[in-house]
A protein has these predicted regions:
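A short loop-to-beta-strand structural motif that recurs across blades of beta-propeller domains
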Residues: 59-61, 100-102, 161-164, 204-206, ...
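Beta-strand-rich domains and repeat architectures in extracellular enzymes and scaffolds
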Residues: 2-16, 24-59
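Blade-edge beta-strand/turn elements of extracellular beta-propeller
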Residues: 14-33, 67-76, 107-119, 162-182, ...
Length: 308
């Protein structure tokens, strides 16, 4: 049943307090329990609801902000993982079971955005982000093809775990960045000059430079390493701080200089996070078996990509 749980902010640097990252009177609220592995929350402002994934149960769920009710958004859903919105407010989903990235149109139909690279099937797309130019970037580890639990066991046709870009005009899938062991969450800096990618198998977040044309220009450097767990999804707030779902360590908050400022401690393994709500100050947390939320003292970026 939905309710409130005590939450704990762990302050590791005084900037976590002075930056008002934590809201002292907020609670960690349990919105739903009953998933087998929750992932990919995305807030849909036009309808005031949240869609998220229950990967092993092969379904997308929907939580209504006004009523608190939960229902099935789509099932089967291709063992969905990460979700995001494009500039038109359409749902973009990484279907790791179907080994593809799709877009749900406003009429409910599903369009395949990417399922192959140079004629070879993708591994199991994990997470996606949309740049302001309309391009869709996604990570493609092999997590969904190593067993039948969250997808379908298969051999990798590509033979590597990469990050790809889908051109908004042509739909062409190109290699954006490589050299990862297990690329997972990805997000652009607020000015879109840097791309941050969590590598779950390497237990770190890598940051890469991006030029004016939207091309990655280097191999990147390590932004932060995860101690006592591994990174999954990552998000920025409006102040340029990076928030990371750290499996085994709650939610970590990093200063732009890479300093770990503090943590939100959650009573389950955390896989994915998303800012949402009318004021964009509510963090939704997809954990192992449940969906949580907490109101923070900071806000997230606009819900939809803004053309620069």
């Amino acid at each position: 049943m939905p309710g409130h749980h005590p939450h704990l902010y762990e302050t590791l640097d005084d900037r976590f307090r002075t930056g008002k990252c934590a809201s002292g009177d907020s609670k960690l609220e349990l919105l739903y329990d009953g998933t087998r592995w929750a992932e990919g929350p995305v807030y849909v402002p036009a309808g005031r609801y949240l869609v998220w994934s229950d990967i092993p149960n092969d379904r997308l769920l929907r939580w209504d902000e006004t009523t608190g009710s939960v229902g099935v958004f789509r099932s089967p859903a291709g063992h969905p993982n990460g979700n995001t919105l494009d500039a038109q407010g359409r749902l973009v989903t990484c279907e790791q079971g179907n080994r593809r990235v799709t877009r749900t149109e406003h009429d409910g139909s599903v369009t395949v955005i990417a399922d192959r690279y140079r004629g070879k099937r993708l591994n199991s797309p994990n997470d996606a982000t949309v740049r302001s130019d309309g391009s869709i970037w996604f990570s493609d580890p092999d997590f969904g093809i190593t067993s039948d639990y969250e997808g379908h066991r298969a051999d990798s046709e590509i033979g590597a775990c990469n990050v790809y870009r889908v051109d908004p005009s042509t739909g062409e899938v190109t290699l954006a960045a490589d050299g990862f062991l297990g690329p997972n969450g990805l997000v652009f800096s607020l000015d879109e000059r840097r791309l941050y990618v969590s590598d779950s198998r390497a237990n770190h977040i890598r940051v890469l430079d991006v030029d004016d044309d939207g091309a990655v220009t280097d191999d990147g450097e390590i932004f932060a390493a995860c101690v006592g767990g591994t990174f999954d999804n990552i998000r920025f707030d409006d102040g340029g701080r990076l928030w990371a779902a750290a499996m085994g360590g709650g939610v970590h908050c990093y200063d732009p200089d890479g300093t770990l400022l503090g943590r939100i401690l959650v009573p389950e393994i955390v896989a994915n996070i998303r800012f949402g709500g009318a004021k964009r100050n509510r963090m939704f947390i997809a954990a192992d078996t449940a969906l949580y939320s907490v109101v923070l003292g900071v806000t997230g970026p606009p819900h939809l990509p803004v053309r620069r």
